[in-house]
């Protein structure tokens, strides 16, 4: 079969639905992306992920294919009129912004992102503005701006790996940012729950939470059973059974503390857990999901992050 190459913006009309089948790979030219005014159903399987990537198949250097370089295409945008979007088992990488959710009615589900990868973006991984979004079992990694940026709305992150090891610019943003203001406009943060998730990266502080300070504008957030690379704080109202990384731990800085491979020199990454990670067996069972990012069954003592650790497979 011939590859599907997209030039220019693919626009999904309001009241229309774009369905992308399991195993589909879409190649986007530098000016191409998807603007969703209606709905998107991109539902792959563990065996047949949907892949959204740039169209260049050559190399920048001998060791570096363009498929591993950020900023190759325009990513996805869900506009104000877009609701009830579902993405499962999707691998999106190499774009500018990965996924942008424009401001919308927070009482209606805008996006369910489940068992997905958003990686190596020359902008945001996920930029969520005043929207209702549920993110689970997903890897959001290596972005110039925030891996996940939440500007108001209702957002849940469960069993996610959010790691900021972006190699192409030292001015990379924190892995996770959340606030109740954008462009000097107050936007209530109804909820930002980060559960059973890893938030880490190179810098000592990978979390940026900013409250406008206006008591009339909601700023609701919780961290539950997560591992955070940020200065330790005592906040019994918002932080529950959560571990703070030691910023002096060079293994964490190098990614070796948690992940199988973080090689900035060759731009090779594998965010499956290493056998040294404190994420193993540390998730909250009450919030745990039965399967991980790869579709593997979690055990009775599930792990924090999107990947369950399996000793046998990791030793092969």
Walk through the language-model features, giving the residues of each.
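Carboxylate-dense, calcium-coordinating segments in secreted/extracellular and ER-lumen proteins
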Residues: 299-306
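Beta-strand/loop edge motif enriched in small/polar residues
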Residues: 1-269, 276-293, 307-316
